[in-house]
Amino acid sequence: MPSALSMRPWDAALPNTTAAAWTNGSVPEMPLFHHFARLDEELQATFPSLWQALMVVHGTIFLAGLVLNGLALYVFCCRTRAKTPSVTYTINLVVTDLLVGLSLPTRFAVFYGARGCLRCAFPHVLGYFLNMHCSILFLTCICVDRYLAIVQPEGSRRWRQPACAKAVCIFVWLAAGVVTLSVLGVKSGGRSCCRVFALTVLEFLLPLLVISVFTGRIMCALSRPGLLRQGRQRRVRAMQLLLTVLVIFLVCFTPFHARQVAVALWPNVPKHTSLVAYHVAVTLSSLNSCMDPIVYCFITSGFQATVRGLFYQRGEEFKPSSMDVVSMHKSTKASAPIHILSIGSHTLTQPLTNGPEP
C-alpha cells in the first residue's frame, strides 16, 4: 500500500508549500483546476471498475453525440434557409455539444499519454467547463426567444433581429469564458464558499429561474379563454420546449452544481464520496450533448421532416440529392397552413398544424 507521504505526479507541478500541505495531511489551498486535473487518476486508482464503466459510458456519449449533433449542425446550417434567432442560438448550442463530445477523447489521451501533466490537462478541463456553461446559457437563450416569439410577438420584434441574436451569442461565449476561468481559479481548502455560491447563482440558478418562470407564464397563457386553435397549438409547442429544457437542466446540470456547493459547505466530506459524486455528476453533464437533440425537434416545425427526408427514400417520389435544399413556407391558396418540402425537382406537402415558426 503506497504511503500517504509519497510524491504524486501532479505534486511536482505544485509549489513547495502546496506539497508540504499534502504531507501534513491537510487540504492544500490551490485552484480547483489542480483538483479537477487529477481526479481521473484518483478514481482509476481507488475504484478501477467504476472508472472502466464510466469510460464506456463516456465513449458511448461521444459516439452518439457526434452523430446526433453532426446531423443537427448539417440540417440547421445547410438545410434551413430561415436563420431565425432560435436557429442561431441552436447552431451555437450544437457547436458547444460537439465540443463537449470532442473533449472526451482528449480526456482519454491526457490520462493515458500525459498523466499528471497540468499543462496537458488544462485544454481539456477548460474546454469541458467552458462548453458546459455555454450549453446552459444557450438553452436559456432559446427558451427566452421562444417565450418572446409566442407570448409577446409584437413587443419583442425589435429584440428578435438576426443581428441582435448574433450579438447575444458573442456575449454568451465571452461570459461563459469569464465564469469558467473564475470557477477554475477558486482556491479550495480556504474560505471559498461565498465565491462558489455566487458563481452557482450566476451560471446555474439564475438560468434555471428564468426557464421556470417562463414555463409558468406560458402555462398561464394557455389557460386564457378565447385562444385560436393555431395560437394554442403554438403555445403548447413552446411549453413542450421549455419543459424539455427544464428536465435537461435538472438531470444534467443539477448534480454537478449541488456537489460543488456541498464540497464548499462541508470541506470535510469523505474523500471517496466526493470523488464518486464528481465523476457521476460530470458524466450526467456530458449526457446533455445527447439530450439536446430532443430540443431541436421543437425549434422549427420542419426539423423532424427534414431529418426523415435525409434517411428515407420513397421511391421515385422522394429521391434527395447532394444539391437539394429544404425550404419551408406557408401556402396562401390552401384553406389550412401547408408545410412544403422542396427537394430537387420533387415537392412534398403536409399539413403544418403548428404553423410556421416566427
From Swiss-Prot:
Keywords from the UniProt entry: Cell membrane, G-protein coupled receptor, Glycoprotein, Membrane, Receptor, Transducer, Transmembrane, Transmembrane helix
Q: Which InterPro entries match?
A: GPCR_Rhodpsn, GPCR_Rhodpsn_7TM
**Which ranges does the record mark as transmembrane?**
47-67, 85-105, 124-144, 167-188, 196-216, 238-258, 275-295
Residues that carry a glycan: 16, 24
Q: Which SUPFAM superfamilies match?
A: Family A G protein-coupled receptor-like
Q: What does the UniProt function comment say about this protein?
A: Orphan receptor with constitutive G(i) signaling activity that activate cyclic AMP.
**Keyword match Ubl conjugation:** no
The entry sums up its family as follows: Belongs to the G-protein coupled receptor 1 family.
Main location as per UniProt: membrane
One Pfam family, short name: 7tm_1
Residues in the Extracellular compartment per record: 1-46, 106-123, 189-195, 259-274
Expression sites (tissue/organ): Ubiquitous expressed with abundant expression in intestinal tissues.
Q: Which organism is it from?
A: Mus musculus
The molecular function terms of the Gene Ontology recorded here are: G protein-coupled receptor activity
Which is one Gene Ontology cellular component term of this protein? receptor complex
From the Swiss-Prot or TrEMBL record, state where the protein is found: Cell membrane
Question: Cytoplasmic face: residue ranges?
Answer: 68-84, 145-166, 217-237, 296-358
Q: Provide the topology term for how it sits in the membrane.
A: Multi-pass membrane protein
Q: Spell out the protein name for this chain.
A: G-protein coupled receptor 20
What gene does this protein come from?
Gpr20
- Determine if Transmembrane is one of this entry's keywords: yes
